[in-house]
Regions:
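Phosphate- and divalent-cation-binding pockets in alpha/beta enzyme and binding domains
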Residues: 3, 53, 74, 112, ...
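Donor-nucleotide binding loops and adjacent catalytic segments primarily
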Residues: 81-179
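A donor-sugar binding/catalytic signature common to diverse glycosyltransferases
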Residues: 2, 18, 43, 168-191
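A nucleotide-sugar donor-handling region in carbohydrate enzymes
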Residues: 40-115
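Short active-site oxyanion
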Residues: 39-42, 62, 160, 178-180
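Active-site and donor-binding regions of nucleotide-sugar-utilizing enzymes
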Residues: 1-61
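Short, acidic/turn-prone active-site loops that include or flank metal/cofactor-
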Residues: 20-24, 69-70, 187
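Alpha-helical segments flanking ligand/cofactor-binding loops in enzyme cores
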Residues: 6, 33-34, 124, 172-173, ...
Length: 191
């Protein structure tokens, strides 16, 4: 997004920015998002707070449109698959009606040195609960390898399914069945 916005600004090509004004505390994403906002011409925000935040950045109100999050519309397009088929696709048994936790935790870019310990705290909680848990790898930000190292210390738990990547069809269907989303991912908020 940053490169596109820079090129658009230098080439005098109008740029529309989606999700400007959204917040991620403790992550470099805020700085990048605000920079892209300042380089963009149209702002398609997901909520009223983001609208107000962009106004405070000095953008003109007629250039800001509260359109909501298009990711929500895309969720409706994802077909529902039953627990048996989902289990087959994952290679991990999901039982309809049983509690299910999804753990997605990413490194806080201002706390990279604490990534391993933070992941262990979440994994200790999951271990104590003993509930079926889907654990997704963190993103590729700095510190992610420390989190993955912590993940490996728990991957022998029989109720834990560790996935490097979960395809969208399976992920959305897991979220439909989840009793709890644990961690600091925006997936549960945005989707």
């Amino acid at each position: 997004a940053m490169t596109t916005a820079l090129v658009g600004a230098y080439m005098n090509i109008p740029v529309a920015h989606l999700c400007g004004g959204d917040r991620v505390i403790g992550n470099v994403d805020d700085q990048v998002r605000h920079a892209v906002t300042k380089l963009s011409h149209l702002h398609l925000v997901t909520n009223r707070e983001s609208f107000e935040r962009i106004l405070r950045l000095g953008e003109q109100p007629f250039r800001i449109f509260d359109v909501g999050n298009p990711g929500l519309d895309r969720l409706l397009e994802v077909p529902v698959i039953d627990a048996v088929k989902l289990s087959q696709r994952l290679g991990f048994t999901i039982v309809e009606g049983e509690p299910l936790v999804i753990l997605i935790q990413h490194v806080i870019s201002t706390e990279i040195d604490q990534a391993y310990e933070q992941m262990k705290i979440s994994l200790d909680a999951v271990s104590e609960l003993g509930i079926k848990t889907i654990l997704s790898y963190p993103n590729s930000d700095a510190g992610g390898q420390q989190m993955i190292r912590a993940n490996h210390e728990y991957d022998s738990l029989p109720f834990l399914y560790v996935a490097k990547n979960i395809p969208r069809l399976e992920f959305v269907n897991l979220m439909r069945r989840a009793s709890c989303l644990l961690g600091n991912s925006s997936a549960g908020i945005l989707e």
